Amino acid sequence: MATFALPFCEIPEDLQLRILSLLTPAEISSFACTSKRFASLCQEDGKIWHVMCDQRWGKKTKIQKWANGQIPYRHLYKTLKGLENLIGFWRLCGRANPAASSPPLVFFDWGSSFILGSRVLSTGDDTYEVKKTPFLLMGISPEGRSENFLDLVGGNLRSVDDDLKELEASNNLVSVDVNFMGNGHIMVEENRCFTNNNRREDQRSSGDESDDLISSPNFSEMYTQLANKTSPGGDRRRQKRKEKERQASRTKWEPEHFLKVADCSPTPTRPLQGLWKGFCEGSIELYLVKYDEVGGIICRKVEDLSLSRYTPPVFWTPKHTFIRSPFSAEEELLLNSRIHISPFAEVHENVVSGMLYMKSSCDLVLPGEPGNGIGFLRGEGRVWLYDNGTFGFGFLRDQFIIDLKRVALEDGCLADEVEACM
């Protein structure tokens, strides 16, 4: 059966736009130079740029809701392209003494008309479950400006409307700037200009009200105030004084730096790479495992990586090639004589398929349990790979194995998350 190819110009316009949406802006500019008809098609913001935004982000966010639909789609495309690098895990860095409101791991994902940053925290209930607490919202104003709001207290960003105007009036949110220091580095700092502008607007509005009182006195109100020994505008002054006291009492938001966790997922050649969570010392601890340049594996606590000072790794292995089972009788005894540390609801039934020798310079002994590593090298231990892709580790000086589970994403949401994704 013979087939015929239609010229591009004879294809229906909606299909033309879908095909063009697969190109880059530079390629579309080149295509627009081929004819006046295509130049006109590529210049219509409501057609080509709308389809390009929908093609790239339509399944992730509601592109018509951004900036209340009042900015050109060409501007929206450029903005979303810059923001999409935020999606994923980031870790706090460079803090000498991080505040309790600044957990070491955060996660950015798409909202309906904004990007939402959430702190990743343990539920604290003896399970592997984690929870996301929104703390940073990034959107666009109808004028096309970036609008970023930080929740210092918590709980104010769980239910957000598409209209960000309501957030500007909230006393529990702080306007911040999110500065990109590179593809994998951002700095969040308070937007003082926004605060000062709002303060000047309040002063102007209160001044206008004072002028009205002077020009149009209400004598009955005046006598009432004299009888109550109050002065005109006293309530407003008290309110302003309370607002100043609230501003003074609020802890200044110190700039914070975040680095993107680039290698947070495993690969066939690097099965342990990424973010992990383990039940240690009565709570969930987060770990970051990386493969180094010399063929070894390094495991660090995410919390330690947020500090400005150097902290030793939890463990490191000189090699990354696993020793496969069956193991020697000595290694089998070493494995089977240990207690698996995991949440109470978890039952360890994993089969060990591989093993690595590891070392560490830090103490990892459970409270109240002295090390029993007499005759062993300090920090020597084992990493055991399970048949389901997870692993556990333990030191020869004690009798425990800390089983780790991956901090994973399922359909863009955190696995083992106790709350519904927003």
UniProtKB/Swiss-Prot annotation:
Residues 5-52 form the F-box domain. Residues 197-207, 242-252 have a biased composition (Basic and acidic residues). Residues 197-216, 226-252 are annotated as: Disordered. Coiled coil: none annotated. This is F-box protein At3g12350. It holds the Pfam family F-box-like. InterPro entries: F-box-like_dom_sf (IPR036047), F-box_dom (IPR001810). It comes from the Eukaryota. It comes from Arabidopsis thaliana.
